Amino acid sequence: MTVSKLLKERVRYAPYLAKVKTPEELIPLFKNGQYLGWSGFTGVGTPKAVPDALIKHVEDNNLQGKLRFNLFVGASAGPEENKWAEHDMIIRRAPHQVGKPIAKAINNGKIQFFDKHLSMFPQDLTYGYYTRDRTDGKILDYMIIEATAIKEDGSIVPGPSVGGSPEFISVSDKVIIEVNTATPSFEGVHDIDMPVNPPHRVPYPYTKVDQKIGVDSIPVDPERVIAIVESKTRDQVGPNTPSDDMSKAIAGNLIEFFRNEVKHGRLPENLLPLQSGIGNIANAVIEGLTDANFKHLNVWTEVLQDSFLDLFENGSLDYATATSIRLTEPGFERVFKNWDFYKSRLCLRSQVVSNNPELIRRLGVIAMNTPVEADIYAHANSTNVNGSRMLNGLGGSADFLRNAKLSIMHCPAARPTKVDPTGISSIVPMVSHVDQTEHDLDVLVTDQGLADLRGLSPRERAREIINKCAHPDYKPLLQDYLDRAEHYATKHGCLHEPHMLKNAFKFHTNLAEKGTMKVESWDPVE
């Protein structure tokens, strides 16, 4: 087939040009039940041409539910995985996903989904943990990776994310490379550490955010590369949810806390490397830092969003490391127009490095993430609404919160329901699912205030959280629950972390029955 001029410029390893194929030519390779790896992380850097061709093949041949795959991606993929879910093309999915169609299929039982700490998922895949039932000794049948260039040695230059690609390539039987000529080359931004399994590992040597010690592309055996496909579709990232009064209040509470920590010598004036999740609260915190007059900040995180660009451009942020740059189209345009400036201040690493517990602890990262709910003793639920309905997955929040110097969770004090504008309290007596334990969190913050939990006993934590974080509509209810639980526990000699199990989930059951967590009374306990 004819090779475009753009593709020839991007593919600098000549033997690969003989392997250029159309996506349609690859369709016969894919069989029901295969194990596939995709590149990508938080919806950027994912393959597009081959997954889209498979969707069309399924549509044209009425193969919905008949051509299904076990799909592994570093985190969430792009819109293609949601189309796969709509066409019943996914048997199993891990470890994180975003989108209504795939979440619906998971919660309807059509897709077997499991989430895992993102620092651990790629390495556990290489151990063969997720393919134990295979009888052919393989782990992945095909790895489909998006590249923005291929170097002279055949190695792969990824795009705006690295994710689990190095590990997936290392255990894939065959590799398909989609070279995206619609996206500028990201060559020079990456720092790749290839996987080494125990007992031959050595420590990651990074002691500063801006250190680069690995290689700037992903090595691959050219013999395993079976096809080069040109892709001409850019990543599609929707607009960020704008900050509102609630998220700005949370950001204000956090920034006041940081200033106080600096004042008392517990943080340096430029803080410590920051990790921030995604969403409007995370964006508001970063926007707040833009105006807070902190200088020479550094970032060690999973995902960079548009809000970080203002920090760079006003001189507050010196350097940022992540495994994904998840920018809107205007955000990418800002970066590409000033590429030399950003290239010298950005590093993209694999997720096993960006989320590595040893490095997070060594660097003293300040971790900030958003839960579904937290309870009065500081356990947090990040994944399952009412204990059962999966949202997206654990992601990397626990990688950071367990190991950070400061572990912070932020959320609105209350959320609306159809019948009550404050029908859901984010602070509950007992969370309906536990992702982060009371041992992981240092600080809980809502739009109502900030609870500093360091060094407090469970009952002290409960009062701090109720007084500082709970919505006024729920403070009396939560305090009444705690008082009654303490009365019960005093009689039974279990006062360390008192609960009334009979009432522990009454907020949730009341919500299911009446559309609000505002319980009218507690059931009596003896």
Swiss-Prot record:
Q: Which residues constitute the catalytic centre?
A: E302 (5-glutamyl coenzyme a thioester intermediate)
In the UniProt record, which is one GO cellular component term? mitochondrion
Phylogenetic lineage: Eukaryota, Fungi, Dikarya, Ascomycota, Saccharomycotina
Q: Which organism is it from?
A: Candida glabrata (strain ATCC 2001 / BCRC 20586 / JCM 3761 / NBRC 0622 / NRRL Y-65 / CBS 138)
Q: Which UniProt keywords apply?
A: Cytoplasm, Hydrolase
The reactions it catalyses are: acetyl-CoA + H2O = acetate + CoA + H(+)
- Give GO terms: molecular function aspect only: acetate CoA-transferase activity; acetyl-CoA hydrolase activity
Question: Would you tell me the protein name for this molecule?
Answer: Acetyl-CoA hydrolase
What family does the entry list? Belongs to the acetyl-CoA hydrolase/transferase family.
- Residues that hold CoA according to the record: G277, I278, G279, N280, I281, N392, G396
Role summary: Presumably involved in regulating the intracellular acetyl-CoA pool for fatty acid and cholesterol synthesis and fatty acid oxidation.
Tell me a GO biological process for this protein: acetate metabolic process
